Every structure is written in structure tokens, then in C-alpha cells.
Amino acid sequence: QPDFMRGLLLLHSFEFDAARESFRAAQARDPGFVMAYWGEALSHNMPLWGEQDLEAARAVLQRLGPTREARMTRAATERERGYLASVEALYGDGTKVERDARFNRALDELARQFPEDLDARSFHALSWLGLSGSTRDTANYMRAAAEAEAVYEIDPRHPGALHYLVHAYDDPVHAPLGLRAARRYGKVAPAAAHAQHMPSHIFFALGMWDDAIEANIASLATARSQGQGGYHALEWLAYACLQQGMREDAAKLVQSVADDVARNPTPGNRTTLAYARAMWLVETGSADAMGRADVDETGIKSIYAFSAYDFARGVVAARSGDVAAAEARARRLQARSDTARGDAVGVVAS
């Protein structure tokens, strides 16, 4: 049905919230449609960032049936049972590492049983990426690439294959292999802001700054047309502008985030501003007003953005000979490391 298919396409492009809404709409049309529950449950898993809302996903499955056995009996076909078994593995007992491994094995079995199912094979590729959590394991990433390449050969417009190829090749060594997928992906999924942004990961690695600027302008426009901030694309756009010597354009972008924070100081907006100011400081080496003001981090759990900002302020202070200020930032970094070790994840892959 259309709602389910829309949710599936959005899921392949990591538009998790929008995908969830579509899967719920599919359930409303047909409360017994097992795959709509599968999709909603899977939307709570963000493998490239090592994040997962286990409680919410299990609640979705509970709406389908009170036990695994009860849920499996509602699957109408062998293929549906395979899909459902995959999320049962992902959200079952055990540690996240154990559940991710079982999810990978379940999708491997499904893809082997139904090799014509390009979505199953694409999700299998994604599950290889998810085995690495927030780190990059080259062997697993190349396994993901091999599976996604096989899907690409059959359907070069498959959004999952294109997206996961970009992620699999997202490093300076493998980036040339990802250029083909990067060129296609944004055109295949024009309504997904993430799909517009992701090709710039490859463009960044290859120093293709004009292409990176174009991709992130498109991503930002798509996000804003849907009522989203599009801040991740904005940060990358500002960085790409600086690489092209477009300092004034980059400054306007960073200032626009500060203006948004002044109007609406949400945790997300403030985190973005910390990232943006850190980037400005490192790239320009200038401790001007653009980068100098601290950002309120009240109520923000993630340490990464503010650690990056402390680091940038410390580097600029050290370069200018202000040893005391540099040491103060170093102490702040150490304190963050001591109190929130392991929280800084999910940046490179996003």
C-alpha cells in the first residue's frame, strides 16, 4: 500500500520520523498489516550512529502481539516471517552488540532465501554497517559494499543500495569508489534532506567543494521546506564555503545559527551552534566574535559538540600565546572525558 511504500523509501534514507508516520498510517489503513509494524519498529534503530530506542521499538511489537510467538503467527507469508524475525532478533534479549549480530544473521538468511528482494539485500548491507556501531570497521564496511554493489547492478536507482554505498565508501581511501553512487543518490530521493546531504561525504573526501556546496544547499532547502532546521547540512555548507575562500558566506551561515539560538534556544540548536563555532575557529584560526562566545550547554547530554568547541578555543588560544586560556580549555576537555566517556558518537556518519 502507498503509505507503507513511502515509509520504506524514507527508511532507506534515514528519514526516521517521517518513515514512522507513514508506517503508522499504513497500520491505520490495515491494523493487521505485519510489515507496517516491522517498519515502524525498525525506524527506532539508527545503526550508523550506534543508537537505538529499544523501549519504543518493543512497544511497537507489543501492539502487534504480546509475545514473539503470537506475532509470528500473524505473518501471512514466509517472507513476512523472515522480516519479522529480523526485528525480533534486533529487539530481543541480550546486549546491543549481540542483538545487532543476530539481526545481521537474520537478514543474511532472508536475503539468501529471497535473492530477488532488493530491499532485504539492502537492509542486509546496512546491518553490516551497524555491526561496527559508531566506529568504522573496514572489513564490515566492505562486506556492506559488496552486498549493496550487487543490488546496484540489478537496480542502479535503488535508494538503499545508493545510500549504503556512500556510507560504506565514506573515507578518503575508498571515496573514489563511492562517487558513482554519490552522483545518483540525491536525484533518486529528492524529498529526503539526508539524501541530498549524503553525497557531500564523498565530495568532501575528494575535495570536490563545488559539488559539496551544491549538495548541502539542496539538503538545506529540502529540510527547510519540510519545517526542519537542516543544521547538519548548514554546518557542512559553511565548511565547504571556507574551503573555497567564501569566508563571508560561511560567516553568514554561522551567524544564522546564532540568530536561531537567540530566538529558539533548543538543545539541538545550541549543539549546532557549538559545532559551527568550533569549525569556524579551527578553519579560520580567528578568535573573533563569531567564534569566541561560549554556548549554553544546560540540559545537553552529548559532550561531542562542546568538546570540539573547547578544543578549538584551546588551539586558538595556544596559537596566540595565551597559555592560561589554552590550559583552562584542556582542563575542561579532561573533565568532560572523565564524566561522560563514550558519549561522543555519531558524527562522521551523519
Could you describe each region identified by the protein language model?
Residues 26-29, 111-113, 152-154, 183-191, ...:
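Solenoid-like repeat scaffolds
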Residues 8, 14-15, 41, 45-51, ...:
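Short coil/turn linking the two alpha-helices of tandem helical-hairpin repeats
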Residues 125, 138-191, 195, 202-205, ...:
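Hydrophobic, small-residue-rich alpha-helical packing segments that form membrane-like cores
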